[in-house]
Amino acid sequence: MRQRQLFSVFLLLLAFVSFQKLCYCDDQTVLYESFDEPFDGRWIVSKNSDYEGVWKHAKSEGHEDYGLLVSEKARKYGIVKELDEPLNLKEGTVVLQYEVRFQEGLECGGAYLKYLRPQEAGWTPQGFDSESPYSIMFGPDKCGGTNKVHFILKHKNPKSGEYVEHHLKFPPSVPYDKLSHVYTAILKPDNEVRILVDGEEKKKANLLSGEDFEPALIPAKTIPDPEDKKPEDWDERAKIPDPNAVKPEDWDEDAPMEIEDEEAEKPEGWLDDEPEEVDDPEATKPEDWDDEEDGMWEAPKIDNPKCEAAPGCGEWKRPMKRNPAYKGKWSSPLIDNPAYKGIWKPRDIPNPDYFELDRPDYEPIAAIGIEIWTMQDGILFDNILIAKDEKVAETYRQTTWKPKFDVEKEKQKAEEEAAGSADGLKSYQKVVFDLLNKVADLSFLSAYKSKITELIEKAEQQPNLTIGVLVAIVVVFFSLFLKLIFGGKKAAAPVEKKKPEVAESSKSGDEAEKKEETAAPRKRQPRRDN
């Protein structure tokens, strides 16, 4: 009885802890989209004519899990979901996370999200396009030389009032495979931003650091004076020609770089009177050739056959060699410039656009938009999350992404091992077939050559017969071995030594040998490697 009571208490505690954790996750979760249900009504497709791509509610390949699918190649796509209320990014930690899978790979296309700021009055989700202003853009992008996980903060300059895109420097690369990957951006109150790929930190940066973002959120305190000009007498030459240097008297600037080799002699047998090319004697004028329309017909040229055996034809000329007296154009040696003042640059003045920030002046997030152009289909978005706690994002990664990724990884590993085994088998078969082709040409196997050749050809057409062919060849060898061993021990039959019979026997043997040679199959051409 007491054990039942303890067990009941344990279940109640477990249920309470689970409920508390669930409540905590719900409290810290701003938005979570699993796409378990069709997205119609929650996500609004842009009606802009540029966005012809069709979004579909589809399963991830190999899973029962649904996502938002890019279904067509070479299209622009636009879709948006509004938050129930704008999220203030200035208060505490904010985590942006989502999964994306390139089921057909990714050669050229984007798969990033735009976290839209509140739009102007009159804006509707149906009008979403590339001009719809955002606060943050985050996610993978790959095309040509571009291969990065974007993190772009669009920040309002407090001096000019203009919005400026600040790009994360040296962002992580996009994983190059067809597996599900989860991308996470964590914004901390201390201005730190961390980028995670599959839960692993790939980049840490400070939003206010000029070393981490381009351009920097906080401008430089000083700038070059735009009105400052270089003085006319400012000399930037570190070296100058020596004004006291004199050209040596024996310096010949006109001497050529190369001269004829006077020691060279014409090779013996050189055919001076033979041209290198002659008319093709076998060429004939085409029957439809019209001299008036096509011009005078001339036979095509071929290499002079007489020159093939000779060291050369035509006029012989001495080869050229480097001129030992060549020195080129003389110039004065360089010396340090006594008037050198260094490279001029304008003086620095206080930057009139300088301002200071303790924290970025984030714009609230009012909606999530996907606005991409891609050459690939099969891009699947899933489990889009906005949370206020890193642990919540980690929980979602472990429960939604990790199980799928593990299954996909195991499948990929099995496919790679199978492909490796297939390549190994092909190499093995090539070695076997090359060896069997050589075996088939052995003279003492001439009686069996046709059978061996037939077996090899069948095996080449059906590589899975390789083992069977090897067994068959072994049987042939074994049979031949037995015949040689046991057949050689039989007593020779008595033959009367009669010259006519011997001659007749010899003659018939020669004829039989000739017939056998005639009947033997033609030597098989070596197999071409595939």
Swiss-Prot record:
Region annotated P domain (Extended arm), chain positions: 223-356
Keyword Membrane listed: yes
UniProt topological domain (Lumenal) ranges: 21-466
Membrane topology per record: Single-pass type I membrane protein
Spans of repeat Sequence: 225-236, 242-253, 261-272, 280-291, 295-305, 314-324, 328-338, 342-352
Binding sites annotated in the UniProt record for Ca(2+): S34, D65, D382
Gene: CNX1
Location of this chain's protein in the cell: Endoplasmic reticulum membrane
Protein name: Calnexin homolog 1
PTM annotation (Phosphoserine): residues: S508
Compositionally biased spans, kind Acidic residues: 250-281
Function: Calcium-binding protein that interacts with newly synthesized monoglucosylated glycoproteins in the endoplasmic reticulum. It may act in assisting protein assembly and/or in the retention within the ER of unassembled protein subunits. It seems to play a major role in the quality control apparatus of the ER by the retention of incorrectly folded proteins.
GO biological process: protein folding
Disulfide bonds: C108-C143, C307-C313
Keywords: Calcium, Chaperone, Disulfide bond, Endoplasmic reticulum, Glycoprotein, Lectin, Membrane, Metal-binding, Phosphoprotein, Repeat, Signal, Transmembrane, Transmembrane helix
Ranges annotated as spanning the membrane: 467-487
Signal peptide as annotated in the record: 1-20
Superkingdom of this protein's organism: Eukaryota
Region (Disordered): 216-315, 490-530
GO cellular component annotations of the record: chloroplast; endoplasmic reticulum; endoplasmic reticulum membrane; mitochondrion; plant-type cell wall; plant-type vacuole; plasmodesma; vacuole
Segments of skewed composition (Basic residues): 521-530
